[in-house]
Amino acid sequence: MIGRTHMNGTVTEETIGQAVQLKGWVQKRRDLGGLIFLDLRDRTGIVQVVFQPENEQAHRLAESIRSEYVLDIKGTVVQRENPNPNIPTGQVEVVADEVIILNASKMTPFPISEEAEQTSEDLRLKYRYLDLRRPSLQETFRLRSKASNIMRNFLDEQDFLEVETPILTKSTPEGARDYLVPSRVHPGEFYALPQSPQLFKQLLMVSGFERYFQIARCFRDEDLRADRQPEFTQVDIETSFMDVEDLYAMMESMMTRVMKETLGKDITTPFPRMPYAEAMSRFGSDKPDTRFGLELIDVAEAVTGAGFKVFDMALESGGEVKALNVKGAADQFSRKDIDKLQEFTAIYGAKGLAWVKVTADGLNGPIAKFFDEAATARLVEATTAEAGDLLVFVAAKASIVADSLGALRQKLGKELGLIDETVFNFLWVTDFPLVTFEEADSRFYANHHPFTMPRREDLDKLETDPGSVLAVAYDLVLNGYELGGGSQRIYERDIQERMFKLLGFTEEEANEQFGFLMEAFEYGTPPHAGIALGLDRLIMLLAGRTNLRDTIAFPKTASASDLLTAAPSPVSDAQLNELSIRTAVKQS
């Protein structure tokens, strides 16, 4: 038998009485006293097939069939006696006339169903080709394909050109570590896999393309987290002569279409905007989740004079005292529970987590004794606290207060059910500092990358007060995740040279690394700006998943290993000799 008349998921009541030919995998087999039932699965769904004893040849073969066998079946669609309302094909079944076993299967190491979620992820990654058979994962990749095509079509309608940029490129010292590729024809020299197409897309603007996009593969040798992978995909966009307001509007239109055509959700535009400083002050994060409140509250004035030394010392040294008001949670948290919260904030540098519970009579807790009636009134007013609320405090330098309370806010939001998981809140975070000073290195680092344009009105401060200079940079945030980041780019050589100098490059180093770019700026480079959206992360959020690996067909583990192919792996001495390489493995 060859051919296929129907996909399994399309065999519904409209096909009753029709002869069909189906192909697929056996999801489940049941032998019920003569009748044998199979659930046959393909990429569109599952349909029940019944083998009757009267058809001896097909019935005999069905007795030998097991889960995940690949079958070719001919039969007739009939009304099902016991319908299954949970699946689209549940009103019908196929009475088998003929069956061919196209391939048998060993017993799988885990069930090809949602029960596999209980299996260790390492085992599922080792047998990724089996894990990918699960309908929920296949649905995620259909979503990914659809979203990619929506964005590609949208950008094509806006007259953007899709241009591929090099994968073998030049190593640069900024950002994460590069993945290096040795050159055989240039012994001792290396290419780098691109961390982004940043330089090439800017050069395409110099080339006069004006509007570019690419669904680009990027590579960063950095420590992994649940939402990071060493190789990832971004929707990369660059445009000339478009001001930032127009770029915002274009991206909002694109995301509106993605949300509508994938999830059927309408979202409101324009997206809210929030300066970086406000995001850090209110939410303790530059990617705030605005689906719930529980904002950080500055209580410096309220606690001044209370006499609690920890607060006083933090304020005297230029730090902050901020609080979270966990509404109605006083009775939910025991001292032991609060100790666990303190251990959590310690991860982010907080040396302690002070707390009080608000009662009808005032305050209760370890630091309540420091608050007299007047101080209690000030604190209650500052935090809008009521009886039954739990107030938690961190006193430290601003960065530690933001990091620790911001992380605690997110943790409590999830654990207390404060987040509406059906909501998608987009947000532009703007006005980032251009650079950050790292005390450990005694130097400035670019907050985004070295090619980000400072605000024109701040250029005079680039050498004298660089820490106060703001960038024309913006991040698109969705539900507490950075979905993408972009900026207006430097396009004048003198500003780029000043930026490199600020970042600690000597003139020689800047020319060696980026001389080609600065020379290009001397040939009539237009003003340009762009953005890159993380496709893997976008799909993770659209699909309601929490692990980025679920959106990548063949992902790496947290240790950057591929358990399926056993990569990375040693290579032969002959290969190394051909590349003029000798390995020297560090002893751990």
Swiss-Prot record:
One of its GO terms (biological process) is aspartyl-tRNA aminoacylation. Keywords: Aminoacyl-tRNA synthetase, ATP-binding, Cytoplasm, Ligase, Nucleotide-binding, Protein biosynthesis. InterPro entries: Aa-tRNA-synt_II, aa-tRNA-synth_II, aa-tRNA-synth_II/BPL/LPL, Asp-tRNA-ligase_1, Asp-tRNA-ligase_1_N, Asp/Asn-tRNA-synth_IIb, AspRS_core, GAD-like_sf. It catalyses: tRNA(Asp) + L-aspartate + ATP = L-aspartyl-tRNA(Asp) + AMP + diphosphate. The keyword Ribonucleoprotein does not apply. It is found in: Cytoplasm. L-aspartate binds at residues 174, 220, 448, 489. CDD domains: AspRS_core, EcAspRS_like_N. PROSITE patterns: AA_TRNA_LIGASE_II (PS50862). The keyword Protein biosynthesis applies. Its EC number is 6.1.1.12. ATP binds at residues 220-222, 229, 482, 534-537. SUPFAM superfamilies: Class II aaRS and biotin synthetases, GAD domain-like, Nucleic acid-binding proteins. Residues 198-201 are annotated as: Aspartate. It holds the Pfam family tRNA_anti-codon. Its main location: cytoplasm. One of its GO terms (cellular component) is cytoplasm. Catalyzes the attachment of L-aspartate to tRNA(Asp) in a two-step reaction: L-aspartate is first activated by ATP to form Asp-AMP and then transferred to the acceptor end of tRNA(Asp). Belongs to the class-II aminoacyl-tRNA synthetase family. Type 1 subfamily. Homodimer. NCBIfam families: aspS_bact, PRK00476.1. This is Aspartate--tRNA ligase. It comes from Exiguobacterium sibiricum (strain DSM 17290 / CCUG 55495 / CIP 109462 / JCM 13490 / 255-15). The lineage of its organism: Bacteria, Bacillati, Bacillota, Bacilli, Bacillales.
